[in-house]
């Protein structure tokens, strides 16, 4: 999960440095992480479930997923409650001290993973062969990979900002909203491709725990480490429209959790997740074209999400009752 989040790290830190030097809002950095987390939950798990139903262990609901929910809520509180900038505007921000707390959070999370791994060290995977590699060769690969990620991240940030500027100028649209749209969609989907490939391959091999674990770990890493590092470098200010995107991220987290409670995301569930993303994408386009949040569009989107969550919950309870009978 940490490895597949490297593109998000490169893009968000790159945008943070760009804002530090040139000024402006970090719409790409914040949009990248929020959008990537939404993509992981709705697109990655959605496509994985369409290929092969995802069976979810009970331990995921009791341990890993509650951590993801807690981290997501903390991120929302930091951004929306404590993140108003000093200029008295409606701009939200992740401040430097908040970033440091998030970094401490990822350290604690890694320590928890190490402790959990030692606790379960008696459980091993059979039939797996690990290809040996010399230390020198490993170092070379790490250096080349790091250089590639950094260079790629800078290129993505530069390209995203230019795309946003070009679209905004040509169509006379709000620059911040266009930049947010690019960050939440094009950049987010692009940086989520490693998670998508990893999860689909794992699902096709029947390794469902890897598919879901990859998404959970990646989303936790995105918030605690990527946002933590990026905001520690430079506070991440972002337009006030981010509250809607964060709410969608929280709703997506809850929706997947409802599936997890009943231990399975089947093909129909996969289509529900993918449909949820399409609804969000339509809203983003409406918001960008109109230049502001539209009340009716917000109401329709949140109403549809509520219906989906209720449907999944009722459907899960019905299937659970049938199994008992």
Question: How would you label these PLM feature ranges?
Answer:
Residues 1-325:
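Hydrophobic alpha-helical segments, chiefly the membrane-spanning helices
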């Amino acid at each position: 999960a940490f490895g597949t989040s490297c593109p998000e790290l490169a893009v968000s830190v790159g945008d943070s440095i760009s804002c530090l030097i040139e000024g402006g809002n970090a719409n790409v950095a914040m949009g990248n992480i929020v959008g990537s987390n939404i993509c992981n939950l709705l697109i990655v798990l959605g496509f994985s479930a369409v290929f092969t139903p995802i069976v979810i262990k009970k331990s995921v609901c009791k341990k890993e997923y509650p951590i993801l929910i807690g981290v997501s809520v903390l991120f929302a509180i930091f951004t929306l409650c404590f993140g108003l900038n000093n200029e008295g505007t409606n701009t939200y921000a992740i401040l430097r001290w908040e970033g440091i707390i998030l970094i401490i959070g990822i350290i604690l999370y890694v320590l928890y993973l190490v402790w959990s791994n030692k606790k379960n060290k008696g459980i091993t995977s059979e039939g797996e062969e690990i290809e040996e590699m010399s230390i020198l060769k490993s170092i070379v690969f790490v250096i080349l990979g790091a250089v590639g990620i950094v260079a790629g991240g800078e290129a993505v940030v530069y390209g995203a900002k230019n795309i946003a500027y070009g679209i905004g100028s040509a169509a006379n649209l709000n620059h911040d909203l266009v930049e947010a749209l690019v960050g939440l969609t094009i950049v987010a989907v692009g940086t989520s491709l490693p998670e998508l490939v990893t999860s689909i391959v794992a699902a096709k091999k029947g390794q469902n725990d890897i598919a879901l674990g990859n998404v959970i770990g990646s989303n936790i890493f995105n918030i605690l480490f990527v946002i933590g590092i990026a905001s520690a470098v430079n506070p991440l200010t972002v337009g006030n429209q981010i509250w809607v995107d964060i709410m969608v991220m929280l709703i997506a987290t809850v929706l997947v959790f409802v599936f997890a409670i009943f231990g399975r995301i089947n093909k129909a569930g996969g289509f529900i997740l993918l449909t949820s993303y399409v609804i969000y994408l339509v809203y983003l386009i409406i918001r960008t074209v109109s230049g502001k949040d539209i009340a009716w569009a917000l109401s329709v989107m949140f109403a549809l999400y509520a219906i989906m969550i209720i449907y999944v919950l009722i459907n899960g309870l019905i299937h659970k009752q049938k199994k008992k009978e």
